[in-house]
Amino acid sequence: MDQTLSSFGNVFAFLALGIVFVAGGYLTARMLRPSRPNPAKNSTYECGEEAVGSAWVKFNIRFYVVALIFIIFDVEVVFLYPWATVFKSLGVFALVEVLVFAGILILGLVYAWVKGDLDWVRPEPKVPQMPVMPDRKAEGGRA
């Protein structure tokens, strides 16, 4: 128990030292830098050319869906690699845990596939057309 706490103590000390180092560098740079804003510095920079149009570019939402699916399975590989390195010593229970983990991710992939999020060009949905009933008032009849 003592060794576990001292190991975590080392991790927390390293984490605290890293945070202090980054925050100290940021604050030192902020205090020492010159601050002379002008319109040229605050404008959009495009390789030395005058900016054309807005800096806000609209991306197709499908790029984000593909990126999120990639990140999910990339993180899966990050979790599976340490498990694979010690697989023999963990036993059957760890194998079942990993199969459940992979199964949940595969179910998510199948759901995205069935929903059509993996199709780049989606087919247009067919909307049923209702027949137009003639207006009897326009024909002079009773309604």
Swiss-Prot record:
It is an enzyme of class 7 (translocase). GO terms for molecular function: NADH dehydrogenase (ubiquinone) activity; NADH:ubiquinone reductase (non-electrogenic) activity; quinone binding. It catalyses: a quinone + NADH + 5 H(+)(in) = a quinol + NAD(+) + 4 H(+)(out). The keyword Cell membrane applies. The chain crosses the membrane at residues 8-28, 63-83, 90-110. It comes from the Bacteria. The keyword Transmembrane helix applies. Signal peptide: none annotated. Keywords: Cell inner membrane, Cell membrane, Membrane, NAD, Quinone, Translocase, Transmembrane, Transmembrane helix, Transport. Its EC number is 7.1.1.-. GO terms for cellular component: NADH dehydrogenase complex; plasma membrane. It is found in: Cell inner membrane. Belongs to the complex I subunit 3 family. This is NADH-quinone oxidoreductase subunit A. It comes from Chlorobium phaeobacteroides (strain DSM 266 / SMG 266 / 2430). The gene is nuoA.
